[in-house]
Amino acid sequence: MNLQQQLSHCQQHQHLLQLTHFNHETAWQLGEKIKQQAELQGVALAINIRVNGQTLFSYAMPGTCAENADWLRRKRNVVELLGTSSYAAGLMLQQRQTSLEERYGVSLRDYAALGGGFPLQVKQAGIIGSVNVSGAPHLDDHNLLLQVLADFIGLPAGSIELLAPLTE
């Protein structure tokens, strides 16, 4: 899959992976599902769900460290700045042959355009926050979020095409 195809898939994913509602209980349920999927895949993740500037779910699985929490913050900052997944942001920057620093004037110490951050979007309301994970390779972080969100909103298994590493 080339860069343009991946960007197109990312746009489709964001359009499809919208929730009908979201509240504190929903955040807890989504966070638990992410934890369960990570356990099934044998990866240790730090997980953060944030809505309107408030953390509604935060969990660090055994095997994670403070560095993972920092990656969560940096990925979340990209989602909040650009309103798209942190993975899609990285693809857009790559396509434009630029960086977060050059295009937006932000520090890479505070922003990371790598997979693992995804906007929480509610139908008829728009983006209300983000769900973020860190602990696996960044494309795996992104794909895990796609899998869990698709299942969480009740999409049929296999209806979301997971992303593979870029090819030319």
From Swiss-Prot:
Q: What does UniProt list as this organism's lineage?
A: Bacteria, Pseudomonadati, Pseudomonadota, Gammaproteobacteria, Enterobacterales
Q: Which HAMAP family match?
A: UPF0303
Name listed for the protein in its UniProt record: UPF0303 protein YE1367
* Pfam families in UniProt: HbpS-like
At the top level, the lineage of the source is: Bacteria
The organism is: Yersinia enterocolitica serotype O:8 / biotype 1B (strain NCTC 13174 / 8081)
Enumerate the Gene3D superfamilies for this protein: Haem-degrading domain (3.30.450.150)
Mind telling me which InterPro entries this protein's record contains?
PduO/GlcC-like (IPR005624), PduO/GlcC-like_sf (IPR038084), YBR137W-like (IPR010371)
Q: What PANTHER family does the entry give?
A: PTHR28255, UPF0303 PROTEIN YBR137W (PTHR28255:SF1)
Its family remark reads:
Belongs to the UPF0303 family.
